């Protein structure tokens, strides 16, 4: 069903891509090179680059480049897999807080789809789909590594020839997506991992594990103590200091303070986004004493922050409304505009000050809220790229 020979079949670009824009619909004959299938016109260059490892895991990287001398509008761009017809089952997985990893097989009659519309790319759906051929008793697992809001759809289709095929279309969500590519500009589509399996129960997950061990070597994590796991947001010197002493006796290496240390009133949640110590509740301005005690006991001090979110009435939003995106009415939240470099630099400065003041050696960066509408109309492609740049800059400033 799926080997490297898959990419040597099919001559129509629709077998590998789906998209449209000011240039019309993506279609026409493809060409091939070493590890690449591509389609070049006067307007664009589409490339599907692929590799296959020793365990049968295929990595697919697709891109589209504007090769014309004028801007090109792009309303949709996705990757495609086309398989022979037959009777199929499709596996998808739901993912949400307290209801993670709820997966099931569905009989494919017309179409089965899954997607993630939020800036949190695993909200509502896991970016994963599996196919099972009832005739051949084998399947294909397909993982999407999102760089934007995304969608995956498996459907019976009669558009690529006279016989019905199984077509999987996946990539950046088409909702609220209208991107203009400047001459020479490249849009990188989400990376895809896929492999064949014969065990329907675990989908030969050892193949994925082997891939991850090679490309993302396991790190030994330190022993970390989180104050939330003891008493949630009840933070006071008389409550936390004994925990510091006991944690040190237990061999804890990092001791960090979770949510509730910041704000300007009794309800800290109303001040999310204002990352300065609360002088009314919690430690009442004396958190540095906790940090010093942690270090005296031979541990490293950490702090909880949530830089991407802010309450509408926070001082940060009032001071810099141009740095935030207003969420929908239901969420009643504002979101730092990571697509705005000036906003990113400002937040990096805020975190720099916290690290210097408290000697922070560990940050828990929580990501608790969902935003579903991208004002830039890129399905959060610019937002995610900005967030990645933000994290990279933070690590470069503070490699320790």
Regions found by a protein language model. Give the residues of each.
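Conserved, mostly hydrophobic/aromatic
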Residues: 62, 184, 225, 247, ...
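Aromatic- and glycine-enriched glycan-recognition loops and surfaces
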Residues: 231-318, 345-346, 382-389
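Short, well-ordered coil/turn segments that N-cap beta-strands
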Residues: 219-223, 251-253, 295-301, 359-361, ...
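Short acidic, Pro/Gly- and aromatic-enriched capping/linker segments at domain boundaries
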Residues: 162-182
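Short Pro-Gly-centered flexible turn/kink motifs
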Residues: 179-197
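Glycine-rich, aromatic-flanked loop segments that form ligand/cofactor-binding clefts
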Residues: 6, 10-28, 133-152, 194-215, ...
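Active-site neighborhood of glycoside hydrolase catalytic domains
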Residues: 284-286, 296, 316-400
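Polysaccharide-binding surfaces and accessory modules of carbohydrate-active proteins
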Residues: 1-160, 175
């Amino acid at each position: 069903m799926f080997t490297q020979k898959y990419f040597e079949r099919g001559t129509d670009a629709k077998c590998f891509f789906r998209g449209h824009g000011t240039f019309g619909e993506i279609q026409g004959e493809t060409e091939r090179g070493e590890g690449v299938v591509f389609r070049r016109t006067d307007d664009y260059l589409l490339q599907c680059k692929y590799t296959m490892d020793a365990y049968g895991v295929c990595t697919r990287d697709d891109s589209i480049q504007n090769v014309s001398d004028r801007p090109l509008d792009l309303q949709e761009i996705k990757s495609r897999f086309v398989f022979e017809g037959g009777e199929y089952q499709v596996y998808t997985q739901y993912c949400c807080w307290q209801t993670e990893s709820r997966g099931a097989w569905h009989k494919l009659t017309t179409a089965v789809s899954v997607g993630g519309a939020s800036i949190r790319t695993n909200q509502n759906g896991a970016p994963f789909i599996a196919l099972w051929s009832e005739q051949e008793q084998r399947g294909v697992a397909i993982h999407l590594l999102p760089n934007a809001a995304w969608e995956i759809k498996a459907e019976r289709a009669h558009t690529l020839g006279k016989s019905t095929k199984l077509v999987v279309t996946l990539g950046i969500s088409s909702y609220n997506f209208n991107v203009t590519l400047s001459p020479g500009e490249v849009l990188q589509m989400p990376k895809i991992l896929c492999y064949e399996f014969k065990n329907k129960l675990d989908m030969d997950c050892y193949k994925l594990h082997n891939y991850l061990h090679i490309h993302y070597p396991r790190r030994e994590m330190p022993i970390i103590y989180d104050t939330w796991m003891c008493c949630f947001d009840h933070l006071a010197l008389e409550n936390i200091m004994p925990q510091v002493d006991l944690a040190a006796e237990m061999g804890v290496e990092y001791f960090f303070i979770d949510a509730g240390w910041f704000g300007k009133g009794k309800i800290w949640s109303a001040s999310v986004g204002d990352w300065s110590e609360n002088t009314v509740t919690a430690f009442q301005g004396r958190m540095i004493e906790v940090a010093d005690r942690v270090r005296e006991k031979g541990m490293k001090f950490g702090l909880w922050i949530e830089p991407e979110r802010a309450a509408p009435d926070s001082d940060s939003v009032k001071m810099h409304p141009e740095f935030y995106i207003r969420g929908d009415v239901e969420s009643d939240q504002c979101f730092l505009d990571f697509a705005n470099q000036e906003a990113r630099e400002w937040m990096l400065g805020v975190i720099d000050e916290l690290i210097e003041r408290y000697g922070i050696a560990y940050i828990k960066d929580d990501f608790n809220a969902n935003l579903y509408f991208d004002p830039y109309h890129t399905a959060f492609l610019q937002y995610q790229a900005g967030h990645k740049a933000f994290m990279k800059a933070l690590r470069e400033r503070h490699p320790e």
